[in-house]
Regions:
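Short alpha-helix boundary/capping motifs
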Residues: 64, 154, 172, 176-177, ...
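Short, glycine-/small-residue-rich phosphate/pyrophosphate-handling segment
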Residues: 23, 115-170, 189-192
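Intrinsically disordered, low-complexity segments enriched in small/polar residues
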Residues: 160, 168, 178, 224-225
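N-terminal beta1-alpha1-beta2 submodule of the flavodoxin-like/Rossmannoid cofactor-binding fold
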Residues: 1-116, 180, 184-238
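Short helix/strand-capping connector loops at secondary-structure junctions
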Residues: 166-184
Length: 238
């Protein structure tokens, strides 16, 4: 079995509940984290609403009217990570405002380059975990995973997982039911996909790290800006 020690993973929780309020998404994050930690992956969870991340599309929002912004420091932790998992609840069939804020701040630094001249997130692996009621897991995952790949994260197979309750008001993931069991804990679909996602994230991150990442051929913004065209032919001159 591969040795995953040395890998780092960050889970961002887009819950709208400030600590110490209960986050159902945290419970699903814990399922994935425990698998990673059993295999030597260093993990941390950042609850976006409590993190001090300002709203905006600039790398440091203190330069644009905000009194404080912790994103520059958190961004350094993202750069040091191999795996980034964007997690959160569904509200009105969509990702929460805190989840969207995180995506916007990742986008704010999307122009940064790594030491190969590639976009900064090129050799990092992305995934997502979603919790909610009624509907929306696939819609939310679609938005998140599209955004991550657009920012150059590598998305492995089965990179999303989630749980949905029944339509209408009812228990959320992890809530205690009348019989003493916990809602969602017995869902084979959720448990299987969360496990597969976690392992695929680790496998892909390990492959990228051991190989030195994707070659900087045909994907270096630095080289493109320097005039390289990587066999591109302008159709106007064919």
């Amino acid at each position: 079995m591969a040795d995953f020690s040395g890998l780092k993973a960050i889970y961002f929780n887009g819950t709208l509940e400030k600590a110490p309020g209960k986050s159902h998404t945290d419970l699903l994050i814990d399922v994935s984290r425990k698998i990673m930690e059993k295999h030597g992956v260093e993990t941390e969870v950042i609850r976006v609403i409590d993190s001090g991340i300002a709203t905006g599309l600039w790398p440091d929002m203190t330069e644009h009217g905000w009194e404080t912004d912790t994103w520059p420091e958190i961004y350094e932790r993202v750069k040091a990570a191999d795996i980034v998992v964007v997690c959160g609840p569904i509200w009105l069939g969509d990702n929460s405002s805190e989840t969207k804020k995180l995506i916007e701040r990742l986008y704010s630094v999307g122009h940064d380059l790594n030491d190969k001249g590639q976009y900064m997130f090129m050799n990092k692996v992305g995934g997502c975990l979603i919790t909610g009621n009624e509907d929306g897991v696939k819609h939310c995952a679609m938005d998140i995973l599209y955004s991550l790949q657009h920012l150059s994260f590598t998305i492995p197979p089965t990179a999303d997982a989630g749980w949905l309750g029944e339509i209408g008001p009812g228990p959320s993931y992890g809530d205690e039911l009348p019989d003493g069991t916990r809602a969602g804990f017995d869902s084979d679909f959720t448990n299987r996909n969360t496990t597969f996602m976690t392992w695929n994230l680790m496998h892909m991150a390990k492959l990228l790290k051991d190989s030195g990442g994707l070659p900087a051929v045909g994907n270096s913004r630095k080289d493109w800006d320097g005039g390289a065209r990587f066999d591109f032919e302008n159709p106007e001159y064919r």
